[in-house]
Amino acid sequence: MEGEERKGEAGPGPGRLSALQEQLIWALLGSGLSREVLVHALGELERERVTPGAEKGDRGDGESSEEGEMDFPPPIFQELEALAPEEAARQRALVDQLLQEDPWRVAKLVKSYMQQHNLPQREVVESIGLNQSHLSQHLNKGTPMKNQKRAALYSWYVRKQGEISQQFTNARHALGSGEEQGEDVRKGRRNRFKWGPASQQILFHAYERQRNPSKEEREGLVEECNRAECLQRGVSPSQLAGLGSNLVTEVRVYNWFANRRKEEAFRHKLALDMPYNSQSASSTNHTLSHSPEQGMKYSQQITCDNLGSSRGHNGDRGLGGRLASPIQLEPSHTLLETHHHKPVSGGGPLPPVSTLTSLHSLSASPAPHHGLIMTSLPSVMSLGESSLLIGQTVPVINNVGGGFTTLQPISFQQQLHSTSQQQLTQQFQSHMGHHHSPFMATMAQLPCHMYSKSDMSHYPPSSLLSQAMVITDSSSLGTLTSLTTVRQILTTDPEEQTDQPIQEDSLHLQSPSPVPVSSGNLQLYPPSQSSESHPPHRLSSSPADINSYIPAQMVSTAQ
């Protein structure tokens, strides 16, 4: 109790204890603690707050750093112990002084010194054993660092200052023992040469003037760069040897210019390749978007497949050598062909009408279109007094009332003489001329191909079956059906016109009467002929009546 009274009497010196503090003291004394034990415990707490408290606070500041990284002393501390006692004491005093200052201000000071002397962070990492990422964050952003790590960093900074100052001080007589000592010091951690900002500015200005300087010009640049490096470090240019590994040489200047020329050539190549890459990419996208159309092929059904055999059976020498059989033609012709572009000459065959199929809905279209008839008529050929036998299919595309559209080949023969040729041409052009549609007016401007007998030798046999596409409305089909249906016979000599007529039973539709046609099911080939040719195409049912669209001349034969 006597100690309690003394404690209470000693308390009101600077100020009286609060009621809570008095309760705490009475509780401690009441727990069995004596006055001596309590005073000793207070002294221990005060000592821990002064010395170990700083280390404890340093742990709190270094929470972002790697734990357990500095369990062993850094290598820089071992090197510091190897120095002379006076030098070691001096460096420890400088390190303690830096530890008392603001860490962020000291970090900026160390970073500025490293940039001034072109010192890489790798050298710091190898000297103090610190993580380079943590060191970079501390120097650039002021990331908190433990006192032990900061002490290692500041120890390296202080020692490096002394080494560099000694290099420039002893630069004049460093050719002797000093150079060997420097080699021994840098043997384990040789720094890589790094261009300083002052030297780079000089070299870039020189590169703008001359991209490939001569050796004399490079030597002049070496002197300018070394002078700038010395001034950057705050030393006299006479202390040039103090630059050490950062000394600029003629070989390094030559390599710098060579690297810049390579970089410029590479950038120029990239600039040239950029438009080509963009163009190829756009063309690739365009090709991919149109790839379904490239694979579409439109075939033409050829029904006159026995033409060559009938010619050989009847022994017609002239026709065998001059007339081309439809079998010689390719059975499939492409209207949209991208891989093989065949030039279309004046006497070459026009591409046949393609097999176009389109399914339209009557309810979707507000007004049904007129039925369109697309036919492929034989070309009009003038061969003097002789005539040409044309026996081929005429594909007809019929679109009735917006219904199903399909291709229907019709086989018929015509004999066109000089008078009938002119009539056919006049009728066709007059019909197209009176049509008011712009598209039909454009089609009317297409000329009918006229050939003479002398020009036929310049064309392949397939040109004898050239076609002319006719597109007309179903309402004007009467003009088309009024064309004269005749037959032409080609002979090699006008005197052979009186020979025995050629039997062409296999080329004609042997039906005494026109084939019955109905709007429900349109069949343009009788079953007797479809067995030896391609299967017939049938038009689907359509609500409109197309009986008036199919003339008898197009399905009958002219005997």
UniProtKB/Swiss-Prot annotation:
Protein name: Hepatocyte nuclear factor 1-alpha
UniProt-annotated stretches for the region Interaction with DNA: 121-123, 134-140, 146-149, 192-195, 252-254, 259-262
Chain segments carrying region Dimerization: 14-43
Chain intervals with Polar residues compositional bias: 499-522
Residue span(s) of domain HNF-p1: 13-44
Keywords, sorted A to Z: Activator, DNA-binding, Homeobox, Nucleus, Transcription, Transcription regulation
DNA-binding region: 188-268
Primary localization: nucleus
Compartment(s) where it occurs, according to its Swiss-Prot or TrEMBL record: Nucleus
Species annotation: Salmo salar (Atlantic salmon)
Tissue expression remark: Expressed in liver, intestine, spleen and kidney.
